Amino acid sequence: MSQNSSIGKGNQSPPLFDLYEGHQEGSETEATSAAKYPNLFKSETTITDLPELVKLLHKFLETKNVTGLALIARQKGLPPSMRAKVWPLLLRTHPFVLKPYITSDDDDGDDVDGEEEEQEDDLHSSTPDNSTTSSNDTEGSDNEYPSSIPIHRIRSELQRYTIRSNYNKDIIMSLSPQVRQLFEVQEQIFHTIERAVARFLKKWGSIVHYDPGLVWLGLALAEWIPPLPEYSYILCGREHVARNGTKLRDINDDNFQRLYVNDDISSIILNYQSEDAKFSINENKEPSNDKSNKHQKNLSFAELYERMVLVVLHSPEQSDVVETDSMHERTNNILQTIPTKGGSISERVSFFLHCFRHLLPELSNYFSEEDILNGYNNSDEWVIWWLKWGGARAWSRFDRGRVWDYLLGWRNGLPANPNSKTEILRHQEELEEVRSCLDSHTLELLGPDLFWNPLVKEDVDSTKKPEPESCALSRKESLKSMLSTLSLTNNTALEWSSSSVGLDERERQSNHRDTLLQIPYSQIDPHSALVFIAVAFLKSKEFALLELESTEILEFLNKSSSLKFNGFQSLISDPKWDTEDADVRKIMDSYNNSPEDRDVRHLPSSGISYTAEKDSKTNSKGKRAFSPSPPSDLSLTGRYRSQPKRSPRGIENVITEAGELWRKWSWQELVEDN
């Protein structure tokens, strides 16, 4: 990364970094951690660098402790190979799934598929059925769907994913039986995604009209979770093709477990997975603990997809702010409600542009000059793909996977159903297990909530929620009120966390103090966090983007990655690569010429080779840019050929920087006279 994004360093205002009570400079524990994990305090450490957290993750997974899994997922992310096991559990109990709310496309005004409007009468009722699709009901024909569901458009969009394969049926039939079987499995996977999208539209179609983003959400989910329970294949990514010509890779491939993993972590993951032998989302072993009973029913891919869409497209209920025609007061209302509730997609786009202009003024002005932001309301544009669809189609699968770890791990600390005594007891049991596993060292590894804020205490009564009348205040007062609301929400979560049936008042107070230091709950809405992640992503590439022309910028924004090599994308990659052209070329050439680097255990004899482009290119400004364009590092059976430990730290730095930008923005709004 080109900028220093570590907490407490850089050019941020000092008052923002002294407010986290758990951080003490110069402490013995910190010194020990810094010596053992030199990158921890440089915002570069991922969970795959921390064996302690990986072991803790496995413990929570064995007991199906969703509270612990969510904590690790949002704070440090998940090892890529573990997402297929953890994401289904997080999706079961996500607050946006248990209490879904989606704003109608008609209200957002960003749906460009006008044909769907005339089809609305034929779709399902406007009040969706709360029953869940049966896992046994994954097979079916087109006749089971209303004729208004655009199956042909869904299939057409799915074909875009395989455009780089360039294989037709005649070529496929000429291949070996093993390869033909893989293509048949690939076709079944696409049919499964197609049915998942169609069933979602059948259930929610009166609210959510068809959009290509729905298809790409399904494809993105299939890049981490096997869509077919009888197979362990996932999709390898939009930009990658396996050597045999498919878009598949085997989740049981040992190389997959070692991706971005050091030797210690690799042995931990492999030992854990050897207990389950071959992976299947329908073969997860259920623990004997009674509290896991609610997780006994396995979810089909269609059910997981529906829950994923509910999380990504979640929009809050209409806020209770005072309606006004004043642009100034409307801006203040948005500033107060967006961080706490997220807002509709149109509000989030407006908030993103506001933050972009204030936090990255030079790049924002350059984008305006190059007409990059024109037409952002069109659902085909990059801003919508980033903010509304959670990076589907636009971000690399590894960057998107880490961001989705945060989205799915988001929790406010409250029980899933505060009115259910059973749910409260389950929440308390999980919380007690989490607290029993957390010591000071583990807490340091997890760190505070990524979006902790400088609590504003002066002139604010944090014991009560702001009255609606207080919303029409100055911008500074609006921010104070908003931060007070965040503080109040956090205190409410702590009260739930520290209260247990059968504890006396003294024990409850002790638990409250312990939990304050132990559990870093989410403090801002996850879709608001996504806004700052988007700004941080742009900041990480700011200097390179300022050197590109509009067409190159748009190409990058629509196919973004924290580590990219193709063509002008080499300018966007980590600066270290600029001095390693010869070394990178040597690595690539040695790989292509080294037979021992080809794992042929399952590769059919007539497999199709994937050839990487290694030519140097010249960008539009006449600058020579090395383009190693690594071959399919996600191939079905081959070894990985890109530098494995750089990409995850790239997106980890982006997310850490997003928290810094959130604090910088809130500080600017508080101290500057706007």
From Swiss-Prot:
InterPro entries: Rab-GAP-TBC_dom, Rab-GAP_TBC_sf. Residues 125-138 have a biased composition (Low complexity). One of its GO terms (cellular component) is cytoplasm. PROSITE patterns: TBC_RABGAP. Its main location: cytoplasm. Residues 104-121 have a biased composition (Acidic residues). SUPFAM superfamilies: Ypt/Rab-GAP domain of gyp1p. The keyword Signal does not apply. Transmembrane segments: none annotated. Coiled coil: none annotated. Residues 1-33, 102-149, 590-651 are annotated as: Disordered. Residues 1-14 have a biased composition (Polar residues). It comes from the Eukaryota. Residues 77-411 form the Rab-GAP TBC domain. It is found in: Cytoplasm. Keywords: Cytoplasm. Belongs to the OCA5 family. This is Oxidant-induced cell-cycle arrest protein 5. The lineage of its organism: Eukaryota, Fungi, Dikarya, Ascomycota, Saccharomycotina. The gene is OCA5.
